[in-house]
């Protein structure tokens, strides 16, 4: 992977351990261009979509990170680096007694100097809540890797419906885990989906900056 890519973006999808290691089905499901379906496979094709990318695929990501590659995961996709041990002491959590219909809420940036936030003028900005594990539980060793947290409280709900907003106060939703695996590589994780259905335009730069500045870090902080 590293010979072809510096950065891999894993968009919102189910890549849990169970899904990744799932065996192919007895009956293949092709995704390929045919005379009937001429526009399939324009950006990729496979003779069988069933099953996960398996142990071989996991090992390929492991080698990618050990070689200094950067993995960016959003929403449910963060389960992949976390469940396979590529994210150090970062784990997912879903705060109790919170009900929300994807409202806009306030977030606070923990490190304004981080390249992910290039172009952001204020430390507090609006974000789309939901579409993932919602928050991260971060170990002491990675506290300084937290990039942003929820402000929390009903006053932080800018639009939409949300009960229990006080229960997300101070919870981390963006983390830069580096070095990520065996002292190498980088895993940038967003518990929300910064590119949800082309709606939350103000958050797109979180992903763009992560890609463009994959090998940069705040001044004085080393990157492998």
Question: What residue spans do the PLM features occupy?
Answer:
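Stable alpha-helical elements in mature extracytoplasmic
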Residues: 57, 77, 112, 203-207
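Active-site beta-loop-alpha substructure in enzyme catalytic cores
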Residues: 210
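Acidic/histidine-enriched alpha-helical segments
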Residues: 1, 223-224
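Catalytic beta-strand/loop cores that center a nucleophilic Ser/Cys/Thr
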Residues: 82-200, 215-223
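Helical hinge/lid and interdomain linker segments adjacent to catalytic or ligand-binding clefts
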Residues: 1-87
């Amino acid at each position: 992977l590293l010979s072809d890519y510096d950065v891999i973006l894993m968009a919102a999808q189910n890549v849990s351990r169970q899904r990744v290691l799932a065996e192919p089905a007895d009956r293949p499901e092709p995704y390929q261009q045919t005379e009937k379906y001429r526009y399939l496979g324009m950006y990729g094709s496979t003779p069988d979509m069933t099953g996960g990318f398996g142990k071989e695929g996991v090992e390929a990501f492991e080698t990618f990170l050990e070689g200094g590659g950067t993995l960016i995961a959003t929403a449910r996709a963060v389960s992949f680096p976390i469940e396979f041990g590529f994210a150090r002491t970062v784990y997912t959590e879903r705060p109790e007694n919170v009900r929300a219909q994807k409202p806009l809420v306030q977030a606070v940036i923990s490190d304004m100097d981080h390249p992910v936030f290039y172009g952001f003028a204020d430390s507090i900005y609006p974000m789309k809540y939901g579409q993932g594990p919602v928050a991260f539980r971060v170990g002491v060793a990675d506290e300084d890797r937290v990039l942003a947290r929820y402000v929390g409280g009903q006053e932080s709900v800018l639009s939409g419906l949300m009960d229990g907003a006080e229960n997300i106060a101070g919870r981390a939703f963006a983390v830069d885990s580096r070095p990520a695996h065996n002292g190498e590589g980088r895993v940038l994780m967003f518990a929300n989906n910064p590119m949800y259905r082309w709606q939350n335009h103000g958050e797109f730069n979180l992903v763009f900056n992560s890609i463009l500045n994959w090998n940069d870090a705040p001044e004085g902080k080393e990157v492998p």
